C-alpha cells in the first residue's frame, strides 16, 4: 500500500459519496503517476491476469501455494471461477453480460471468457440452454489453480473510469472532453478501431464500459445502486427457471443484507434490517 493506492481508493470513495470534484482530482493524480503504473496494452491484455503486481495493479493481496496455507482458501474472487465450481451456476457469467460484450465480436475482453474445460462433467440446471461460460480473469499463476491468484483490490483501468464518470457529472466543456478521453482509453484498448463519439458520451455509456471492463471485480451492483438505477436479473443458463426479470431497485429492502443474528442477540438495541 502506497500513496498512489490510497489516492486511487479515495477516488472510488469520493465517487460513491458523489463528491465528484475530489474524485476527479485524485483520479488525475493517480493517472499522472510518472509512469509507475500503466494501462495494459491491447496485445498483453489476455495474458496479464495471473501475474503478480501487474502494471495496472495499485493495490492487491498476494497469495502463493509455495507455503503452507498460502493460497486463498476459497476466499475472494479467484476461487469462484475455478473449474471445480461445476454446478455453482450462480457464479458463471450471465447471458445478459455476454450479450453485452457480444455487441463487439472483436473486443479483446472475449479472451477472458471460456467454456468449461470438461463440459461433460458440468451439471446443468433444469431448463438451461447450453453450457455456461466462466470468467477466466483469475487463472492462477501457473494457469491450473486459481487459489494462488492475487486479488487485485483496485487497478488503473478503474481509476480512468472513475475519472470519466466524475468529470462527466461535473460537466463543462473541459471536463466533458476529459471524460471522453478517459473513456476512450478503455474502449480503444479493448478494440483499437472503436471509440466513443462526443455525441455518444453519457452516464449510461460510461457505466456500460465499467460493466464490461470491471466484470468479476465487484462493481456492477454498487454502480447501479449509487446512481439510483435498478438491477434486472433475467433468466439464461444461470437462472433458467426465472420466467420474469427479478428487479432490485435502490429502495429494495434486499439491498441491505440482514444483520447477523449473533449481533442482534448481543445488542438488544440493534434493529434488524428489513428483508
Residue ranges of each PLM-predicted region?
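Acidic/polar-rich alpha-helix caps and helix-coil junctions
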Residues: 1-77, 87-89, 99-275
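Extracytoplasmic segments of membrane-associated envelope/inner-membrane machinery
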Residues: 95-96
Amino acid at each position: 500500500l502506497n500513496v498512489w493506492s490510497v489516492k486511487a481508493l479515495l477516488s472510488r470513495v469520493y465517487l460513491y459519496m458523489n463528491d465528484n470534484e475530489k474524485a476527479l482530482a485524485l483520479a488525475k493524480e493517480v493517472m499522472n503517476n510518472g509512469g509507475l503504473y500503466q494501462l495494459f496494452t491491447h496485445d498483453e491484455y489476455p495474458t496479464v491476469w495471473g501475474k503478480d503486481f501487474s502494471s495496472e495493479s495499485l493495490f492487491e493481496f498476494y497469495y502463493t501455494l509455495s507455503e503452507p496455507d498460502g493460497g486463498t482458501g476459497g476466499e475472494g474472487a479467484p476461487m469462484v471461477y475455478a473449474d471445480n465450481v461445476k454446478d455453482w451456476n450462480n457464479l458463471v457469467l450471465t447471458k445478459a453480460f455476454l450479450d453485452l460484450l457480444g455487441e463487439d465480436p472483436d473486443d479483446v475482453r472475449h479472451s477472458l471468457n471460456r467454456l468449461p474445460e470438461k463440459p461433460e462433467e458440468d451439471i446443468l440446471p433444469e431448463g438451461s440452454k447450453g453450457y455456461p461460460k466462466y470468467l477466466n480473469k483469475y487463472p492462477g499463476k501457473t494457469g491450473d489453480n486459481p487459489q494462488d491468484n492475487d486479488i487485485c483490490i483496485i487497478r488503473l483501468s478503474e481509476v480512468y473510469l472513475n475519472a470519466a464518470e466524475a468529470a462527466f457529472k461535473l460537466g463543462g466543456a473541459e471536463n466533458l472532453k476529459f471524460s471522453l478521453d478517459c473513456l476512450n482509453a478503455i474502449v480503444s484498448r479493448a478494440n483499437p478501431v472503436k471509440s466513443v463519439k462526443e455525441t455518444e458520451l453519457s452516464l449510461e455509456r460510461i457505466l456500460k464500459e465499467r460493466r464490461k471492463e470491471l466484470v468479476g471485480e465487484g462493481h456492477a451492483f454498487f454502480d447501479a445502486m449509487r446512481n439510483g438505477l435498478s438491477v434486472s436479473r433475467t433468466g439464461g443458463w444461470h437462472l433458467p427457471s426465472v420466467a420474469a426479470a427479478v428487479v432490485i431497485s435502490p429502495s429494495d429492502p434486499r439491498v441491505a443484507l440482514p444483520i447477523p443474528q449473533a449481533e442482534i442477540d448481543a445488542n438488544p438495541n440493534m434493529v434488524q434490517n428489513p428483508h
